[in-house]
């Protein structure tokens, strides 16, 4: 299934058992590839996502309570209230405007507000890095301790430049609104360790539903093991990756040695 399948058969996917549960949560995609998709999550899924976010956040250098700046397009269906911003100790930074003045204001806020964690679109963080380099800004007065790119693949040279500028690790999350945080980039290379306890992953060939060979670029297909309100089974989310299986302590774990964005944005043979 894919997003179009969910949109066309939306009511049939919703679990009758969980449909009207008062503690459900509705997550919305940004709609960058079409109409936003509303995804219902049950209480246990929400709790599992929260626990996963805490664990993978700490692994990336972000801890609960840190001042966080989140750089993305803040459309109405994801915009946070003033209470939520206080509760989460967060600053919203809008990436829909990234001219020199906007970047200067962004850097000033990061420095003045003593932001400790930067989360944002990879492209927006790249533009901020480029602005710092061109303007000769001094990052030594900044308090940033962790940078977490999301949504797009960050080129390795940009990642290493950001690490040098702010003197902190830059490790991307692999995540989406439908499922949550699904993996964390390795510290020393571009690969990802993915959460195989919460999700079952398949890497299928680009032009068929046969499993891709190890080391072959393929489509990511996800089964969410915890969302009972809106079962996500064999979901082709449009992303592509090269996967390898590694043995550790008698168990084989799946790693993504290369991760790319939406298939519609790629050219391949």
Residue ranges and their predicted role:
Residues 1-28, 34-50, 54-65, 74, ...:
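Nucleotide 5′-phosphate-binding alpha/beta core
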Residues 54-97:
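Conserved AMP-binding loop of ANL adenylate-forming enzymes
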Residues 36, 76-78, 227-230:
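Short, acidic Gly/Pro/Ser/Thr-rich loop/turn segments
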Residues 87-269:
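Active-site glycine/GP-rich loop and adjacent strand/helix microenvironment
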Residues 27-28, 83, 256-259:
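Short, flexible, solvent-exposed loop/turn segments with mixed acidic/basic and small polar residues
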Residues 19-20, 29, 164, 225:
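Short hydrophobic/aromatic segments of transmembrane alpha-helices and their interfaces
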């Amino acid at each position: 299934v894919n997003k179009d399948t969910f949109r066309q058969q939306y009511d049939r996917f919703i679990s009758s058992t969980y449909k009207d549960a008062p503690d459900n949560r509705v997550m919305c995609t940004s709609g960058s590839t079409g109409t936003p998709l509303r995804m219902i999550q049950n209480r246990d899924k929400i709790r599992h996502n929260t626990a996963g976010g805490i664990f993978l956040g700490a692994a990336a250098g972000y801890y609960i309570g840190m001042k966080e700046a989140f750089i993305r397009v803040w459309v109405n269906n994801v915009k946070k209230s003033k209470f939520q911003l206080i509760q989460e100790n967060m600053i919203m930074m809008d990436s829909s405007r990234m001219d020199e003045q906007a970047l200067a204001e962004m850097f000033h806020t990061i420095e003045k507000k003593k932001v400790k964690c930067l989360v944002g679109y990879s492209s927006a963080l790249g533009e901020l890095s480029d602005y710092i380099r061109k303007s000769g800004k001094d990052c030594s007065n900044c308090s940033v301790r962790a940078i977490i790119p999301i949504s797009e693949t960050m080129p390795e040279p940009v990642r290493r430049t950001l690490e040098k500028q702010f003197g902190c690790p830059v490790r991307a999350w692999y995540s989406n609104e439908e499922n949550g945080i699904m993996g964390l980039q390795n510290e020393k290379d571009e690969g990802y360790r993915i959460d195989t306890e919460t999700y079952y992953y398949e890497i299928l060939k680009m032009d068929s539903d046969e499993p891709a060979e190890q080391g072959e670029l393929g489509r990511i297909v996800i089964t969410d093991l915890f969302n009972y309100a809106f079962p996500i089974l064999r979901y082709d989310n449009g992303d592509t990756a090269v996967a390898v299986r590694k043995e550790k302590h008698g168990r084989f774990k799946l790693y993504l040695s290369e991760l790319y964005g939406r298939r519609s944005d790629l050219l391949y043979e």
